[in-house]
Amino acid sequence: KKIYTLFSALCLAAAAPGTLSAQNNFKLVEESVSNPDNTPAPVYPVPSERQLKWNETEFYAFFHYGMNTYTNEEWGSGMERETVFAPTQKPDPRQWLEVAKKAHMKGGIAVVKHHDGFCLWPTATTEHCTRNSSGYGKNVDIPKEFADAAREFKMKYGFYISPWDMSSPYWGKKDSNGKYTDEYAKKVFLPQCVELAKYGNDQFEMWFDGATGGDHDGGYGSYTSSQKRTIDNAQTYYDIPNLRDSIHNLLPNVIMWGVGGEARWIGNED
């Protein structure tokens, strides 16, 4: 945009009235103006394109289904036998998303592994998964069914996977010097995230919870005895920088929510 400014010519020489023309009295000057719309400078940090796109989702659903459905517990312990997961008919993620669609939601997140560690897909990382369940459970692959249904309804989809895992003997494990080992991150958590990423590069969110053990008892590899474990720094324990890069290489548009992610609680949660 440009503006035009009229400058009055200052005549210092004596002249008789009326001898100067209007052309000599005024001069038209063309100037370029920086920031003509007065756009404010950004106040850092500013959201990334990935975050802005994620924010457009606005209204979407969380679907909680898993081992706790059959134990009637809010949180499991990782000590549940796999055969307790025993659906008598095929779970129907399509029906879940159909209801969300009717509510004018734009997408959904399926909880495919909660703190008890039971995986709702036949993962290669643990025996604590649908592969070893009973009833129709042996045929369950919730991530696949959920992703297929989301594409059918043209909805966004993603997965919740708990970093905390009360079924894994590696979680919170320490070496002989009392230092946490990296076995869980390398052998379990990162491989599980990579497995989920392979269900579709059109995922919009991977949701990590921030729970870090503490007062809740877990089996940590045992079906019969429980113990308490915790970790001191989730960022380093889960190798978050490597995790973030690895997932973004597979899913360029996915937002990682929670531990070390790009979206988080707004600060008022209890």
Where would I find each of the regions flagged by the language model?
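Bacterial Sec-dependent N-terminal signal peptides
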Residues: K1-N25
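Mature catalytic domains of secreted/periplasmic carbohydrate-active enzymes
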Residues: Q23-D270
